[in-house]
Design a protein with these regions (language model features):
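Histidine-centered divalent metal-coordination motifs
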Residues: 8-12, 83-84, 182
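Active-site-proximal loop/helix segment associated with metal-binding centers of metalloenzymes
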Residues: 11-27, 120-177
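A short, structured loop/turn motif at beta-sheet edges
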Residues: 1, 114-116, 171-173
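Core catalytic region of metal-dependent phosphoesterases/phosphodiesterases
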Residues: 2, 15-114
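Short beta-strand segments
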Residues: 51, 180-182
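A generic "structured core" feature
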Residues: 3-5, 9, 41, 179
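Preference for well-ordered, secondary-structure-rich cores of eukaryotic proteins
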Residues: 102, 107, 115, 126, ...
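Structural motif
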Residues: 3, 47, 117-118, 176-178
Length: 182
């Protein structure tokens, strides 16, 4: 019963115009290469946490083939929401868990277990601002207060989601945690 994590599959079976190949030839057939490597490593009784950016799809209908691809991977699959997972609305986690019960598990505002650990996670948020940096000199040349305030809101929201999962795990008696961030 091993625990594995990987992220950023960026599948596009129903959205070929968003194929990763647009970023270069190295991405050709990346999904099949990932599948082959996962199948070499992950066994049916292992847990595979997919840490976000599963699909380029904009909605659940478009995402169906991508999720079927993930379902077919070995192991117990736990999916964390990434910044490109537009098919997964923040208030849909429970609905997704019902729809894919026994096949996929969606991790947001909740927890799953691995041995005596609670698995919790959030997509987190990373931002480059609010400072403007001159790349030639590495000196700060400006500041965007609105960008800073928006970033603080996003970081706070994701932190609350993470804490909700930790609190649920604590209430269930867990004292050890593995935290995943996209």
């Amino acid at each position: 019963m091993a625990l594995y994590a990987m992220g950023d599959l960026h599948l596009s079976f129903s959205t070929p115009e968003k194929s990763q190949e647009r970023f270069g030839k190295i991405w050709k057939d990346h999904e099949w290469k990932a599948k082959k490597n996962i199948e070499k490593l992950v066994r049916p009784d292992d847990t595979l946490v997919l840490t976000g950016d599963h699909s380029w799809a904009n909605n659940l209908v478009q995402c169906q083939r991508d999720l079927e691809f993930i379902e077919a991977l070995p192991g117990r699959k736990i999916l964390l929401r990434g910044n490109h997972d537009h098919f997964w609305k923040a208030n849909q986690t429970e609905k997704l868990n019902e729809m894919f019960k026994g096949k996929l598990r969606f991790l947001q505002n909740n927890f799953y277990t691995y041995r005596d650990y609670a698995l919790v996670g959030s997509k987190g948020f990373c931002f480059e601002g609010p400072f403007f940096i001159d790349t030639r000199t590495n000196l700060i040349t400006g500041y965007d207060k609105a960008a800073y305030e928006q970033s603080v809101k996003l970081v706070d929201r994701e932190m609350k989601r993470l804490i909700t999962g930790i609190d649920a795990a604590k209430a269930a008696g867990y004292t050890k945690y593995i935290i995943f961030l996209h």
